[in-house]
């Protein structure tokens, strides 16, 4: 009887939620990744792009709450171990989830958790659990072919012919990516990715094999004790990412709700980014509360070689091979990687241990940028890591400590307190040795590199009833060795979200970063941002949002200010399978006071551009479903500047005040 009442209440709650809150994937990805993408660091933005595609893939293949395993739920980056345990305990107690609204009955899950989960999981009648035959797995699955194209309509400098009829870039101005995937439920999948960047030619030649980048994988899982086997390209994440970051970065704003897991996440790599992955074989085996994962990889990467080609000094992660000079850097060194991970889960305590070794076929001799730079010549390295997590209803303690072959250490440890269902407080301390070295690490920090940093993060979330949510954090950090950019600072965010009615919400966000810069003069640089957002849903299929942002930058004698105003409209007609999303923005800001804003885009494209100078920007995204097998999305966006007649510089220079981009996504399922 109690179960029946829970289901009825959950169904009513979920129906109201679906009609009025307009939960969509773009809003969720924006909340998770926008902060990470705003870092003035190319690697942070690249990881945010990979993370966006990862979340889109998770949403496209929703987890069934009635059959999802512990490790599958760990793939959701916003779920901690205590939340996963609560979901599984609920399922064990009540049998299964008939509605997503039942998640609201789990006290360990916040309102935000339930909203996020609705994009990535499904519920209903339990599916058949009998393992299918191999023939069925290989023949009864679904095929999908996806093509994405991105191009700039205006001619950029590198594509213009000189007096001799030559162009700097050999290829056309379009970025093209083709993906194929076959999958049968959660048992077997295989596929490939082929991609070329703008300016890269398509053809066969020196270091060219049709598309510039080619990737493939085969995944088998849930076969007896075999949890997962992957051949080809894959990603491994362990603990907090001190030695195995897994290519995922969500930034500081979600640190208090991010992964507090001591476990391991192994998944196939399907992104078009050419660096953050392993190429070889990996396998995970589980015996009740104990699991083992092993992997081996051999991967060629881009780098700048020394004069005699016996060493390399700079690793290139852009993946651009548009000119002969860029092509010279392609596949210049080979990285061999191997590792083993063991995890155990005993009641409230989880423990994990990982050992990873790296070896290059050439010596790595990084260029010294500063007299005090943290550089180190290496040809091989190995790291060890211990990850832990202990949780009760009111308290969670988790973290990871790692060490490289020279005994340089990195550690990150967190205490999370939940005195009641409405309040959560997080304290996190990190200390990364100035000479700590772990390739493919990705952990919380001010820098993308996991070294030379110490910091204290304090965060809180308060839910004052169903209408008001308060959240924020303060992150105090310093770099023990001076760098060319920042030596210390504090990063603060405070946000209030108020749900005035079922159809109207207002959000106010304040962000301040105060950091001591070493160049060009030693002084504090202070950035402040204020964002006010009003969101109104006049009907179930229409959403309107108005956003106003102000920015203020101070450094030495420089004082710059800026503003950004934009209007978003989303419309889904009931009569036809069409989705419309549009924005019109006005902005005026010097470069130092630039502002960022997440944008709707087609699948597998990630857009959080910086708004600066003076002008307007607008975009229109159209999406349609043609039957059950064809999905088409297209986006037209344009920058229009009022204060200049030349956009960008160097190879990307456009002679004019407009820059127009077209993105297209086409998926066919068979």
Model regions and ranges:
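Transmembrane beta-strand segments of Gram-negative outer membrane beta-barrel proteins
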Residues: 63, 133-164, 182, 186-192, ...
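Exposed, low-structure sequence patches enriched in small/polar residues
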Residues: 169-173, 276, 331-366, 375-670
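Outer membrane beta-barrel
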Residues: 208-302, 417-439, 576-592
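Outer-membrane beta-barrel proteins
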Residues: 195-213, 267-274, 328-331, 402-404, ...
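Small-residue hinge/turn detector
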Residues: 80-84, 110-111
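Bacterial Sec-dependent N-terminal signal peptides
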Residues: 1-22, 670
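N-terminal, intrinsically disordered low-complexity tails/presequences enriched in Lys/Ser/Pro
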Residues: 19-63, 126-140
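Extended, structured, electrostatic nucleic-acid-contact surfaces
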Residues: 56-77, 93, 99-105, 118-122
């Amino acid at each position: 009887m109690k179960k029946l009442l829970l289901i009825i209440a959950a169904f009513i709650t979920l129906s109201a939620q679906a009609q009025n809150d307009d939960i969509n994937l773009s809003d969720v990805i924006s909340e998770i990744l926008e902060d990470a993408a705003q870092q003035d660091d190319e690697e942070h933005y690249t990881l945010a792009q990979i993370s966006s595609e990862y979340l889109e893939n998770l949403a496209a293949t929703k987890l069934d709450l009635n059959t999802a395993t512990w490790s599958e739920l760990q793939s959701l980056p916003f779920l901690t171990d205590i939340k996963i345990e609560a979901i599984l305990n609920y399922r064990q107690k009540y049998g299964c989830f008939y509605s997503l609204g039942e998640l609201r009955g789990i006290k360990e899950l916040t309102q935000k958790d339930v909203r996020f989960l609705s994009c990535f999981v499904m519920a209903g009648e339990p599916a058949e659990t009998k393992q299918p035959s191999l023939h069925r797995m290989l023949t009864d699955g679904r095929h999908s072919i996806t093509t994405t194209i991105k191009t700039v309509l205006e001619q950029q400098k590198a594509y213009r012919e000189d007096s001799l009829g030559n162009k700097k870039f050999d290829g056309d101005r379009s970025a093209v990516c083709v993906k194929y995937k076959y999958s049968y439920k959660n048992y077997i999948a295989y596929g490939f990715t082929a991609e070329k960047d703008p300016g890269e030619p398509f053809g066969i030649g020196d270091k060219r094999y049709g598309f510039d980048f080619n990737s493939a994988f085969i995944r088998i899982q849930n076969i007896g004790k075999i949890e997962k086997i992957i051949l080809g390209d894959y990603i491994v994440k362990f603990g907090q990412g001190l030695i195995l970051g897994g290519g995922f970065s969500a930034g500081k704003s979600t640190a208090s709700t991010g992964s507090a897991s001591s476990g391991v996440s192994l998944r196939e790599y399907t992104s078009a980014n050419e660096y953050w992955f392993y190429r070889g074989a990996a396998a995970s085996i589980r015996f009740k509360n104990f699991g083992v994962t092993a992997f081996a990889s051999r991967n060629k990467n881009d780098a700048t070689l020394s004069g005699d080609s016996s060493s390399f000094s700079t690793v290139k992660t852009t993946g651009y091979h548009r000119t002969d000079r860029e092509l010279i850097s392609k596949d210049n060194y080979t990285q061999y990687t191997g590792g083993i991970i063991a995890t155990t889960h005993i009641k409230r305590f989880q423990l994990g241990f990982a050992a990873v070794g790296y070896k290059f076929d050439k010596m790595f001799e990084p260029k010294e940028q500063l007299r005090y730079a943290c550089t180190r010549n290496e040809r091989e390295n190995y790291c060890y890591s211990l990850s832990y997590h202990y949780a009760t209803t009111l308290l969670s303690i988790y973290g990871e400590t790692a060490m490289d072959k020279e005994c340089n250490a990195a550690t990150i440890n967190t205490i999370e307190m939940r005195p009641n269902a409405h309040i959560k407080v997080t304290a996190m301390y990190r200390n990364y040795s100035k000479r700590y070295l772990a390739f493919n690490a990705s952990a919380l920090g001010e820098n993308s590199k996991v070294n030379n940093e110490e910091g204290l993060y304090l965060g809180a979330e308060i839910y004052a009833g169903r209408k008001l949510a308060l959240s924020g954090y303060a992150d105090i950090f310093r770099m023990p060795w001076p760098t060319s950019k920042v030596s210390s600072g504090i990063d603060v965010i405070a946000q209030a979200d108020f749900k005035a009615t079922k159809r109207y919400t207002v959000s106010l966000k304040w962000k301040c970063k105060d950091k001591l810069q070493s160049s060009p003069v030693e002084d504090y640089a202070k950035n402040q941002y204020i964002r006010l957002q009003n969101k109104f849903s006049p009907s179930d299929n229409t959403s309107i949002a108005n956003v106003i942002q102000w920015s203020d930058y101070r450094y030495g004698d420089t004082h710059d200010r800026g503003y950004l105003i934009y209007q978003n409209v989303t419309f889904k007609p009931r009569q036809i399978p069409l989705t419309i999303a549009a924005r019109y923005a006005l902005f005026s800001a010097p470069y130092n006071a630039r502002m960022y804003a997440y944008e709707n885009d087609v699948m597998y494209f990630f857009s959080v551009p910086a708004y600066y100078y003076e002008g307007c920007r607008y975009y229109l995204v159209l999406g349609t479903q043609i039957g059950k097998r064809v999905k088409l999305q297209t986006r037209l966006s344009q920058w229009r500047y009022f204060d200049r007649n030349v956009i960008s510089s160097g190879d990307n220079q456009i002679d004019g005040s407009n820059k127009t981009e077209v993105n297209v996504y086409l998926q066919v399922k068979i």
